[in-house]
Amino acid sequence: MAFVKSGWLLRQSTILKRWKKNWFDLWSDGHLIYYDDQTRQNIEDKVHMPMDCINIRTGQECRDTQPPDGKSKDCMLQIVCRDGKTISLCAESTDDCLAWKFTLQDSRTNTAYVGSAVMTDETSVVSSPPPYTAYAAPAPEQAYGYGPYGGAYPPGTQVVYAANGQAYAVPYQYPYAGLYGQQPANQVIIRERYRDNDSDLALGMLAGAATGMALGSLFWVF
């Protein structure tokens, strides 16, 4: 950060309206700082021109003030601040007054200063678009044209036949097999009765013996 303009100016006090000589520095960030003297040890006040200043008057435009002894009003300038404060200044000459006026006006309106730059950065951050995505993942409705079926299919019917010819039906619940899984169907199961008594076993042996004797007689004839 560097000086834009420096020099002596007469400043009128706000209470006693007396003129006092101060050293002024205008910095490149738009701050106008004035000191007791050129050593810059004691700061009396400072003004941020881009943010605090709303108008600059020169010469006959200056209000509610009179120039110091030996100076004309054309050497005067006033810095009107946003908070209502007015800083009345007087330069060494008319040319010096105009030089200060143009420099201060430029620092107040130049967007390269820090105050305006910060506002520009905040605006760009707020209004910046979201990051670009080359291949966005489609939603399930867009990929397939319909959403997945979330419910279970209705249960099928299981029909069971006993060996005595009687049939009875029981519900059979199929688990959900996905979007393209197997659909439920009706199943038929024939279940034979288990023979575990002695009479059934004897009848089977007798029938086998009779069959063997008949076959033996047939072979004996030939």
From Swiss-Prot:
Keyword Transcription regulation carried by entry: no
GO cellular component: membrane; recycling endosome membrane
Membrane topology: Peripheral membrane protein
Keyword terms of this UniProt record: Endosome, Membrane
UniProt-listed GO biological process terms: regulation of cell differentiation
UniProt-listed Pfam families: PH
Annotated compartments: Recycling endosome membrane
Binding site for a 1,2-diacyl-sn-glycero-3-phospho-L-serine: 20
GO molecular function, one term: phosphatidylinositol-3,4,5-trisphosphate binding
Gene3D superfamilies: Pleckstrin-homology domain (PH domain)/Phosphotyrosine-binding domain (PTB)
Top-level taxon in the UniProt lineage: Eukaryota
All residue ranges annotated as the PH domain in the record: 2-109
Function recorded in the entry: Involved in retrograde transport of recycling endosomes.
Record comment regarding domains: The PH domain specifically binds phosphatidylserine, which is enriched in recycling endosome membranes, it doesn't recognize PIPs.
Name of the featured protein: Pleckstrin homology domain-containing family B member 2
UniProt source species: Homo sapiens (Human)
Name of the encoding gene: PLEKHB2
